[in-house]
Amino acid sequence: MIWFWSTLLVTAIAVLSTANESSSGQEKLAVESILFVFAHPDDESMFFGPTIDYLGNQHSTRVHVLCLSNGNADGLGSVREKELVVAASKYQIDKTNVHVVSDPQLQDGMQAKWDPTDVAKHISQIIERYNIKTLITFDNKGISGHPNHIACYEGAMKIVKATPQVQVFVLESVNIFRKYISYLDTIPTLVQSQAGRNDTIIIHADRKSTQRIRDAMVRGHKSQMVWFRYGWIYLSKYMSNNVLKRAT
């Protein structure tokens, strides 16, 4: 058993050391303007970190982020808005490209029901204003099952139908075992990349990228850094790799 886990760890480290080579499909993101759509400040780092860090360092691509609420469930909305700007700067994203929605119909909360039409309205406004070519958001499981995350997907699906010239990619949710095996998830993800699906993009964060993502979370979203967030930072596979699938 020790031999088995040691082999997995060594393989994972090898993948990390050649992260760029292990990633696949990034050319599909080679567009002038990309929009990340998520529900709460800190979603960008907790879930989309490898992708947003990769794109933020591609100087030919303008990266915008659209946060559909200010995360005011605990009364810290104004603080969290500012924290998002700080975190975005770690990915080389200018504050003018950070957009936070203030809509009474889109409030942070597990019990808050977001109408996909309202979500799509706000997404469409940013797409039109900034000539967005590609949109990246959650899939239909929302990684954690959070209803606000799932509403992002449902709103994006309306964009797929109404604006077919905009390509939409969704972040793949995985089972709870894979979610919390950190770098070891590079193994099943690497196997997945060998399948060569044309509608899939796989991005592995190298050591420097992973450190930037952690820095964005810890130094950016200070109000959210309770004890279990550190567990996420060091155990979640979403801090080290993302799998994006084309939505149709």
Curated annotation (Swiss-Prot):
Membrane-related topology note: Single-pass membrane protein
Protein name, UniProt field: Probable N-acetylglucosaminyl-phosphatidylinositol de-N-acetylase
Gene Ontology annotations for the cellular component aspect, listed alphabetically: endoplasmic reticulum; endoplasmic reticulum membrane
Chief site of localization: endoplasmic reticulum
EC number(s) reported in the record: 3.5.1.89
Cytoplasmic side: 25-248
Catalytic activity from the UniProt record: a 6-(N-acetyl-alpha-D-glucosaminyl)-1-(1,2-diacyl-sn-glycero-3-phospho)-1D-myo-inositol + H2O = a 6-(alpha-D-glucosaminyl)-1-(1,2-diacyl-sn-glycero-3-phospho)-1D-myo-inositol + acetate
Biological process terms in GO annotation: GPI anchor biosynthetic process
Record-linked InterPro entries: GlcNAc_PI_deacetylase-related, LmbE-like_dom_sf
Pathway membership: Glycolipid biosynthesis; glycosylphosphatidylinositol-anchor biosynthesis
Record topology, Lumenal segments: 1-7
Family, as annotated: Belongs to the PIGL family.
Alphabetical keyword list: Endoplasmic reticulum, GPI-anchor biosynthesis, Hydrolase, Membrane, Transmembrane, Transmembrane helix
Database matches in Pfam families: PIG-L
Species per Swiss-Prot/TrEMBL record: Schizosaccharomyces pombe (strain 972 / ATCC 24843)
GO molecular-function term, one example from the UniProt record: N-acetylglucosaminylphosphatidylinositol deacetylase activity
Class of enzymatic activity (EC top level): hydrolase
UniProt key word Membrane: yes
Function: Involved in the second step of GPI biosynthesis. De-N-acetylation of N-acetylglucosaminyl-phosphatidylinositol.
Regions crossing the membrane: 8-24
